[in-house]
């Protein structure tokens, strides 16, 4: 699984590097952030107790763009509420708001979304569902093609959250991801 994530991030970095024009390098602060879903059983670690710290951390590190995992719609809304960020991505359960998101959150004054989409890691990637030997739940990839407003450079960002146990699901998800890229 680590190899898959390495290839995914390598592809992102190569995409950014290849989009450089006239050897003018543009830098972005990018990250991946597993928000941890909001569940009442978390008690004092519930989202209500964590959201201010999460927001502080995001703004402290001044991420330009980052992918999230396990965030419910209301958690994503809490992050973008101050107005400096926007997001793309859908809930994994219905393709709208239900279920966890693998959202891409970005500074809305720095990037334009030129194209975007979502697909599920299953035998039917356009329909919400889980595939192969996935043990838990639907898994999704959210992606977007961005344009950096300051440099004019374009790049793609793919954000994933694989099944944590199904080895065949992980392998097939990687193959599907590479096909989509």
Regions found by a protein language model. Give the residues of each.
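Structured beta-strand-rich core segments of catalytic domains in phosphoester-bond hydrolases
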Residues: 65-158, 162
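Generic structural signal for well-ordered alpha-helical scaffold segments
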Residues: 55, 145, 178-181
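A long, amphipathic alpha-helix that forms part
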Residues: 167-181
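Active-site-flanking beta-strand signature of metal-NTP-handling nucleotidyl enzymes
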Residues: 14, 31, 158
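N-terminal, active-site-proximal structural segment of metallo-dependent hydrolase catalytic domains
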Residues: 18-83, 93-100, 174-175
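Short, solvent-exposed loop/turn segments at secondary-structure boundaries
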Residues: 42-46, 131-132, 167-171
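Short strand-loop junctions, especially beta-strand C-caps/beta-turns
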Residues: 36-40, 160-165
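Bacterial Sec-dependent N-terminal signal peptides
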Residues: 1-26
């Amino acid at each position: 699984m680590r190899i898959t994530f390495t290839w995914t991030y390598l592809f992102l970095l190569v995409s950014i590097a290849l989009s450089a024009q006239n050897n003018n390098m543009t830098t972005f602060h990018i990250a991946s952030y597993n928000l941890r879903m909001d569940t009442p059983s978390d008690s004092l670690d519930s989202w209500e107790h964590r959201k201010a710290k999460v927001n502080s951390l995001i703004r402290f590190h001044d991420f330009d763009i980052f992918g999230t995992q396990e965030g419910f719609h209301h958690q994503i809304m809490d992050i973008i509420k101050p107005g400096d960020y926007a997001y793309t991505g859908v809930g994994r359960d219905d393709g709208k708001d239900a279920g966890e998101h693998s959202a891409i959150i970005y500074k809305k004054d720095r990037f334009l979304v030129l194209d975007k989409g979502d697909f599920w890691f299953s035998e039917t990637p356009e329909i919400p569902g889980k595939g192969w030997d996935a043990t838990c739940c639907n898994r999704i990839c959210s992606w977007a093609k961005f344009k950096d407003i300051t440099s004019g450079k374009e790049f793609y960002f793919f954000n994933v959250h694989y099944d944590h146990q199904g080895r065949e699901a992980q392998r097939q998800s990687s193959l599907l991801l590479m096909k989509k890229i």
